Structure formats: structure tokens, C-alpha cells
A protein has these predicted regions:
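Short beta-strand/turn micro-motifs composed of small residues
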Residues: 7, 53, 104, 132-133
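Short catalytic helix/loop segments, enriched in acidic residues and glycine
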Residues: 22-35
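Conserved N-terminal catalytic core of the sugar/cofactor nucleotidyltransferase
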Residues: 32-99, 112-113, 151, 156
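Short beta-strand-to-loop acidic/aromatic patch adjacent to the donor-nucleotide binding site
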Residues: 98-106
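Conserved core of the sugar-phosphate nucleotidyltransferase
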Residues: 110-193
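Charged phosphate-binding loop/patch that engages nucleotide di/tri-phosphates or the phosphate backbone
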Residues: 189-208
Length: 208
């Protein structure tokens, strides 16, 4: 299995407030992307960790190429930056026949323990598994959910974590059959998209 950190988005919800690219925003003198890569690198299940910036995030690209240049199991591949879904599908095709664990660079509280728990609980009944949380749980932490899913009259939000079996993807243009893994955990609920989210993450970090 390959871990893929998607960090090539424009980060438009944060870009209006700062010139610093979202993956390079800092909590306790450490960038968001470093928290994520560090957690993934501690997981023995991954053959390698691939960081994917794009032309939208040139500073991030330069930063990760420099800081991880001597790490044998960490690779940097630049995407075209044409949008999350398209970039993701190109990576799925590129890394066949591997399974991919995809996530953004905006989950500062993720850790190796929760990553292992996610993988251990995956039932491979669909080529795509998305990790979701109850909307009310995310809101109870103080985060405003972005991607909302309604299932059986209950509202959920996407954690930003997706596991894909590339062998189940026959065509880059196909609509993937998706199953959901419910996991109400703070470690994956704090998804930093705005400066307010960043401030909340900083305050939660000081409480822990």
C-alpha cells in the first residue's frame, strides 16, 4: 500500500487571508504537511509515502523536496493541478496495481495509531472507501464541515481520507463505487481549511 499526500490545491478558503500556502501553515512551529507525513512515515504498512504538490503550490513543492530529500521511502511527484478528482485518478492509474491511502496535508492531529485503525477496519467490498464522520460530532469540536453526505436522513462529512484499490478502477473516467467507514475521532475531524480552523487546531494542540 502507498500513502499519498495530496497538497496541490489552491486552498482558496485560506488564500484570501494569507500568502502562505495551506500545507505550510504552522502549528507549534511545525507545518501542517510535516504532521501528516510524520504520521504516515511511522506506519510500517506503507511501502512508501508520496507527496503530491502541483503548480498551484510551488512553495510547498520546494519545501518538501528539500526537507525530505534524504528519506528513501518518501517521494515527491508533481501533479498537473487540474483539480483533486482528476489528479487523484491520474495517480491511481500511475500506481497500479497498488492500493492507495489518500489524504490531504490538512489533518494535523492524524497519527499512526488512527491510520492503522482505519486500514484494519476497511472492508474491501468496493474499490473506493471514504472515511466519514457524523456532522454533529465534527461541529461539536468547533469545525465547520465542508463536504456533507446525507445517508438514511443522517448527515455526515468527509474526513478527506480515501482508500482506493487501483485494480478495481478499470477506467479513469468511471464513477467509482464507494463505501463508507464511519469513524468519529478528533484526530481526523480537525481538517484545516480556513484561518479559523488553524486557530482552533492551535488551541486544541495546547490543550492536549
Amino acid at each position: 500500500m502507498i500513502a499519498v499526500v495530496m497538497c496541490g490545491g489552491k486552498g482558496s478558503r485560506m488564500a484570501d487571508s494569507t500568502v502562505i500556502e495551506k500545507p505550510l501553515q504552522m502549528i507549534r512551529e511545525k507545518t501542517l504537511i510535516e504532521y501528516v507525513v510524520s504520521a504516515l512515515a511511522r506506519c510500517t504498512i506503507f511501502d512508501k509515502v508520496v507527496i503530491v504538490p502541483s503548480r498551484n503550490t510551488p512553495m510547498t513543492s520546494k519545501f518538501v523536496r528539500n526537507i525530505y530529500r534524504n528519506f528513501a521511502k518518501i517521494e515527491v511527484i508533481e501533479s498537473l493541478g487540474l483539480g483533486y478528482s482528476l489528479d487523484m485518478m491520474q495517480l491511481v492509474e500511475y500506481f497500479k496495481p497498488s492500493k492507495l491511502f489518500l489524504l490531504g496535508a490538512d489533518l494535523p492531529f492524524i497519527n499512526a495509531k488512527i491510520i492503522k485503525k482505519i486500514i484494519d477496519n476497511c472492508a474491501w467490498d468496493a474499490p473506493c472507501i471514504s472515511v466519514i464522520l457524523r456532522k454533529r460530532f465534527v461541529e461539536s469540536i468547533g469545525i465547520k464541515p465542508s463536504v456533507i453526505i446525507c445517508k438514511d436522513n443522517i448527515y455526515y462529512c468527509h474526513s478527506g481520507i480515501t482508500i482506493i484499490d487501483s485494480l478495481g478502477v478499470k477506467d479513469m473516467n468511471q464513477r467509482l463505487s464507494e463505501s463508507y467507514l464511519l469513524m468519529d475521532k478528533k484526530e481526523i475531524a480537525v481538517n484545516v481549511n480556513t484561518m479559523k480552523d488553524l486557530e482552533l487546531a492551535e488551541s486544541l494542540c495546547h490543550k492536549d
